Regions:
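Serine-hydrolase catalytic core recognition
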Residues: 1-193
Length: 193
């Protein structure tokens, strides 16, 4: 869900961004490659390797933030929901010394389990892209978690089924890493509150 820079209130915001800004946090949202409306090459660079090029772009944004005199580079966090939750955990486990805290809501963990209409559209099938599915699975990254990670999951989520989070938690326990896990019984993927 790409964002745009404009000089008006974002009415589609969940309120999280406003809340964090009111608490004194600097929010930075970057449209990485894979976002739409920038041409075919920009959008399709992520094909068969979701999250990989996007992380590179996000880290360019981090470099920019670190160059600002009013940004404390030792206190960076990351937040996202759904694919953004996937990116949150990806960034925290692939760049464990950069992000101190993360909040991942309804995160995709392994594209094998995600709905076919999206997963296979961007990743191809597991049979034709086994390397891509393995490389992008966060199950193999659980051992790299260092910062504080909060995972939020609605138990009635039919978009990113709870199997994603539960399997990641199992991998974290086996690796000796410990994210916080908040379960919301009866809640769907796009919960409020």
């Amino acid at each position: 869900h790409a964002h745009n820079v404009d000089a008006r209130w974002n009415y589609s915001s969940r309120g999280w961004e406003t809340y964090m800004a009111q608490k004194g946090y600097l929010l930075f949202i970057l449209d990485n490659r894979g976002s739409e409306n920038r041409g075919k090459a920009f959008e399709q660079v992520t094909f068969r390797q979701l999250g990989q090029e996007e992380m590179k772009d996000q880290m360019k944004g981090v470099e920019y933030l670190k160059s600002l005199p009013y940004v404390d580079a030792n206190r960076l966090g990351v937040h996202g929901w759904s694919f953004g939750g996937y990116m949150t955990i990806s960034l925290m486990t692939n760049y464990p010394d950069v992000f101190k805290v993360g909040v991942a809501g309804g995160p995709v963990i392994d594209w094998h389990w995600y709905e076919v209409m999206y997963g296979e559209r961007y990743m191809d099938t597991p049979q034709t892209n086994p390397e891509g599915y393995k490389k992008t699975s966060l199950l193999y990254q659980a051992k790299n978690l260092k910062g504080k990670l909060q995972i939020i999951q609605g138990l009635n989520d039919v978009t990113v089924v709870p199997q994603h989070c539960l399997t990641f938690l199992k991998a974290c326990i086996a690796a000796g890493t410990q994210p916080d896990f908040f379960v919301y019984p009866g809640e769907p993927h796009n919960m409020r509150g």
